[in-house]
Amino acid sequence: MQFAKMHGLGNDFMVVDAVTQNVYFSPELIRRLADRHCGVGFDQLLVVEPPYDPELDFHYRIFNADGSEVAQCGNGARCFARFVRLKGLTNKRDIAVSTQTGRMVLSVTDDELVRVNMGEPNFEPQQVPFRAVKAEKTYIMRADEHTVLCGVVSMGNPHCVIQVEDVETAKVETLGPLLESHERFPDRANIGFMQVVDSQTVRLRVYERGAGETQACGSGACAAVAVGILQGLLSAKVRVSLPGGELDIQWDGPGHPLFMTGPATHVYDGFIHL
């Protein structure tokens, strides 16, 4: 099987063309491939499939390193767009794809950055899903001896965003896994730790569902900005600084789609016998 290794700000992927190759990935195989000592090693596996709808270009599937399939990965979407152009699967600059939960348009700019229409953030608890009586800008959550204030949103996948004074000292290693599997998130959640520098700048660390802390999380950056705007902390255009680099996020508020712009890097091509 041929594949490419790619990353978006250090969030790394194994990307596989399932348009011209016949492939099947069991959870066990994905876990073996994800092993950084005995396999290829990655945060997520991205699979390019033929479109389910003739109006679209491709179907986009995402698997975490633990073998679970998820509906959204923003950094992966940028790498997906670069991959299909690099491999000659399309020469379009605006690429329409379906995912497990919806549709996306991926736009490759002249300088090879990728702008992704991530759709409209969804704050309805049952759509996240999140157990709450009604939608709120801020929720109180308790986990063991910890009590935190957070925002909750779906960007096609569930996110919990906590504002912190300093991301460097944030309790990512302890609070991350506690909140990821909290009973109020029936499908688990990605946990973002956001430091607001000013209305146009945030620093962010993300503990990703099924992957742990990563160098960058595109949908997590989108979620953090959406929550920050809803809470009145941020303006419509925000630069998000993650351990792996920076993303530009734009959201004009409820009723509008959110856009993410950032790089996608091709590292190498490989071949593996399964």
Swiss-Prot record:
It is found in: Cytoplasm. One of its GO terms (cellular component) is cytosol. InterPro entries: DAP_epimerase_AS (IPR018510), DAP_epimerase_DapF (IPR001653). SUPFAM superfamilies: Diaminopimelate epimerase-like (SSF54506). The record marks H159, E208 as: Could be important to modulate the pK values of the two catalytic cysteine residues. GO terms for biological process: lysine biosynthetic process via diaminopimelate. It catalyses: (2S,6S)-2,6-diaminopimelate = meso-2,6-diaminopimelate. Pathway: Amino-acid biosynthesis; L-lysine biosynthesis via DAP pathway; DL-2,6-diaminopimelate from LL-2,6-diaminopimelate: step 1/1. Substrate binds at N11, Q44, N64, G74, N75, N157, N190, E208, R209, G218, S219. One of its GO terms (molecular function) is diaminopimelate epimerase activity. Its EC number is 5.1.1.7. The record marks Y268 as: Important for dimerization. The active site is at C73 (proton donor), C217 (proton acceptor). Its main location: cytoplasm. Keywords: Amino-acid biosynthesis, Cytoplasm, Isomerase, Lysine biosynthesis. Catalyzes the stereoinversion of LL-2,6-diaminopimelate (L,L-DAP) to meso-diaminopimelate (meso-DAP), a precursor of L-lysine and an essential component of the bacterial peptidoglycan. NCBIfam families: DapF. This is Diaminopimelate epimerase. The gene is dapF.
